[in-house]
Amino acid sequence: MDRQSYLSELKEPVMETQQIKETIEMISEENLDIRTITMGISLLDCVTGDLQTTADKVYAKIMAKAANLVPVADAISDEYGIPIVNKRISVTPVSLLAGADQNLDFRPIAQAMDRAAKDLGVDLIGGYTALVQNGSTPAETALMKSLPEVLDTTERVCASVNIGSTRSGLNMDAVKLMGTVVKEVAMRKPQNAMKLVVFCNAVEDNPFMAGAFWGISEGDVAINTGVSGPGVVERAIAAKPAASFEEICETIKQTAFKVSRMGQFVGKVAADRLDVPFNIVDLSLAPTPAKGDSVAQILETMGLSHVGTPGTTAALALLNDAVKKGGIMAAERVGGLSGAFIPVSEDANMITAAAKGQISLEKLEAMTAVCSVGLDMVAVPGDTPDATISGMIADEAAIGMINNKTTAVRVIPVPGKQVGDTVEFGGIFGTAPIMAINDGNAQQFINRGGRIPAPIHSFKN
């Protein structure tokens, strides 16, 4: 082989017949898919002194930039035989768009976002967001207080609030407020709480809902993709029942590479056809309630009798790290949350474990120290006190703050339900057993107010 041929092969690696066959099997038999193509759109140029005028400009820009998102994604899916499950949009945090209007009524912008999402045919639109890790402006406070009504009167708008970071500490005033807000959101309709995430260390390029927003350091518009393939990873591990931990890690890495390569390919093709930049691939393993599409099942295939048993956190740490190591080699740029999601209601084996009492909130919290995000799609009794929800948020945020990772809470207090009951959300949102929650009282702690300072290791300069 001459030098030119060698360099050409380095630039464009040849996919062997066996690898092609494996990828086809992943799609047809193991639930491999592109979980989302998400277009990020900056709305900073839509700001005016009048919220209704701003809302009109928001609608116009989203419609202009994302006009071909759904047709292009559908065409790529048909052309290459790769399922693309969701087409989504993330936008600039809405709290940044309204500070010049004294009314601070965000409903016109939320309605404009919802109308654009429906008119374009996208599944969800994220970015009804406030970033309050250092403190809250009047606009940000108004946005947080508007969440119960906005999430009840829109269908496709998703919201998030970042209440802390490793560099800033935790805004406990915002934590207290969000405990009340989450409860009010769920009291109107439990499903509304599925569209709200409370973060610590939120990332600016997350393509997954409900926590996606388009950060202010991002460009005007770009494409992000989120891949998924728990079934692919599980089958690869199942084929090696006697493998050592090193061999399991290597197997996961090789599988994650193939999965992420597909995400890179689809994202690049979509960006090229839409004539916008390609940004990142999110390497997350995102489960669904479908059989064989479970992150918990991967952990059980490693040798656990059920998720939640001692060893679960170690198995999840191994999985999360190996997915990152394998996927990062496959993509030009990796970002988002990138890891393994453990949403209770969206994972068939997690649903089973929760229903049988085999996994507790405390064990889930331990798992969040090593997984992609945090307490996700957790249903709790409807009479759970606001302060208890604030305490859950504070605990998760503290894990993220100290460990310099993204953590989050998407908890759903279900009116009229108690431990042992279940609630049906339907579709990819699945079934949620109502989980027991510690009945202690955190009210005095939450009422102290102020901020929990940033950890000592946050001072890097």
Swiss-Prot record:
Name the InterPro entries on file.
UPF0210 (IPR007841)
Signal sequence range: none
One Pfam family hit:
DUF711
Q: Which domain of life is it from?
A: Bacteria
Which family does this protein fall into?
Belongs to the UPF0210 family.
Quaternary structure annotation from Swiss-Prot or TrEMBL: Homodimer.
The protein's matches in PANTHER family, at most eight in alphabetical order, are given as: UPF0210 PROTEIN MJ1665, UPF0210 PROTEIN SPR0218
Q: What's the name of the protein?
A: UPF0210 protein LCABL_10110
* Biological source species: Lacticaseibacillus casei (strain BL23) (Lactobacillus casei)
